[in-house]
């Protein structure tokens, strides 16, 4: 089961073409995505209500889409507007439509009760389209449940072991984070990690304009069910970074990691690593992107193998350790939200 009354990401804006049909499975539901004649994204059930033929192998006609099995035509609200050879259209001849919002270069979709869809609840990823930041968008498909990816993101002690040559340093294994949970009902977690007078990760070393020890930070906010935004960077040791000062030679990033369940055992993952320096250096943009891709492939190797083991021995217990503090809170919040949607007590 999935949490449904929340905003999920369906695609980067560039994944949905100006003309033509795009499709994805989200939360076990086949979804069709396309742009109308005004460029607005439309999200419909990717299934003709007549014989359940997939609409993505149909044809876009203006703002509508036509099934190319028997020719039924649907408008952006999901209503059938034409049945070839039949004048009367039964009221039940319709398909599901989904609320959708395009913001910060992401296409957001609401898979639950449409009446509860409030665009004001969408998490802000301003660095995606801000002129003061530069990034290259990325996407990974996972053969794993999305919660395993969330576990990974809420426990950065794994950086020392999974990413020793990319994102991690030895100190990541022992540093204890500060974990704060929002109590206003959002369920958001803020996790802060400071590495003072420490080595930089290789990813930071590759772009830094200073050498030697650094004060490094990872301040990440996670919003359920699977939206992570992070402020991370390195500054020369002793230059006031923990107090909020950012000297010109400091390297600063804003990171995005977003997951949407595809099925119970597969997931979509959107990411980027934005920077606020050397904005016109396209080679640097590609270098940072490729560095993150290498690191995330390290994650995927571990997480997909983890999924396979869990499917083989689903009833074997897992023994918690201190490093699980963040992911345990995340799991607890996800469980509460799911129960609330299904008649339990609201979080």
Curated annotation (Swiss-Prot):
Top-level taxon: Bacteria
Disulfide bridges in this chain: none
Protein keywords: 2Fe-2S, Aromatic hydrocarbons catabolism, FAD, Flavoprotein, Iron, Iron-sulfur, Metal-binding, Monooxygenase, Oxidoreductase, Plasmid
Family annotation (Pfam families): Rieske (PF00355), VanA_C (PF19112)
GO biological process, one term: catabolic process
Obligatory cofactor(s): [2Fe-2S] cluster
Principal EC category: oxidoreductase
Positions annotated to bind [2Fe-2S] cluster: 48, 50, 67, 70
Known role: Involved in the toluene-4-sulfonate degradation pathway. Does not discriminate between the sulfonate and the carboxyl substituents and can also be involved in the p-toluenecarboxylate degradation pathway. Can use toluene-4-sulfonate, p-toluate, m-toluate and 4-ethylbenzoate as substrates, but not p-xylene, toluene and p-cresol. Also catalyzes the demethylation of 4-methoxybenzoate to 4-hydroxybenzoate.
Subunit structure: Homotetramer. Part of the p-toluenesulfonate methyl-monooxygenase complex TsaBM, comprising the reductase TsaB and the oxygenase TsaM.
Protein name per UniProt: Toluene-4-sulfonate monooxygenase system iron-sulfur subunit TsaM1
Organism the protein comes from: Comamonas testosteroni (Pseudomonas testosteroni)
Lineage: Bacteria, Pseudomonadati, Pseudomonadota, Betaproteobacteria, Burkholderiales
Gene that specifies this protein: tsaM1
